Amino acid sequence: MINYNGNLTENTNISLEQNRGFLYGDAVFETLKVVDGKILFAEDHYFRLMASMRIVRMEIPMYFTMEYMEEQVKNLANALNISASCRVRLTFFRKSGGFYLPITNDSEFIITAETLQEPLYSFTENSTYEVDLFKDFYVTKQLLSTIKSTNKMVQITGSIFAHENGLDNCLLINDEKNVIEALQGNIFMLKDKKLVTPPVTDGCLNGIMRKQVLAIARKTEGLEVSEESISPFELQKADEIFITNVIKGIQPITKYRKKEYGNTLANELIKKLNVLIRLG
């Protein structure tokens, strides 16, 4: 079951042959984590979605307020009998018609949901998580790279590369050969009490969890926080590297090429993140 424009319906009732999201990737989306019926960081997700729609010149329905978004997500979760935690995808796509040039900028939306086992964030303390660079394709330094659109070929081919090479993830680089993010999350690097993450202007996703971690880190005593470009060479001198996204929270990287990393700061930040959620 899905939520299609505010109506709960079966997936089989949706036609794809004229759907612009399917035909041209003419769609933007948000991945949400819901805990006990509440969207985590709902306001941040809502305003990023609205900004993304404006960037691609997609009309925002007048009725689609943040309260409406929360209500529609809750309606679907209830219909699917999901009571604890779930992963939700909210996708907006331009209405059918036209080729590359649409005949309208009006939009529609679909919401899907699936159960998550863990409501709070965690990672397995002694597990390995190995990454390497994905160099077949680059992410360009432009505004479109910072939004969650359905054009994800770099991430798809990178995921296949990671799978074929026994890696847990890959790090993406931009056209200036700087590391900007992982396949499905932002990246942070710790070196000598300085925490660095690439700026959005480098082409990384304007991540919701990135924003939360930056805010928590800036309140952490003795920790310098900076948004600056990261070269692949700098990664090999780091003390810790971790990935952030709204579903996983924080995922420490344990190995990049021959270098192995700790997770002390990642562990501290994830505890503070869970406190933030409980206080929510």
Residue ranges of model-derived segments:
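Helix-start/capping segments and mature chain N-termini
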Residues: 1-75, 98-280
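Ordered, amphipathic secondary-structure segments that act as subunit-interaction surfaces
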Residues: 79-93, 99
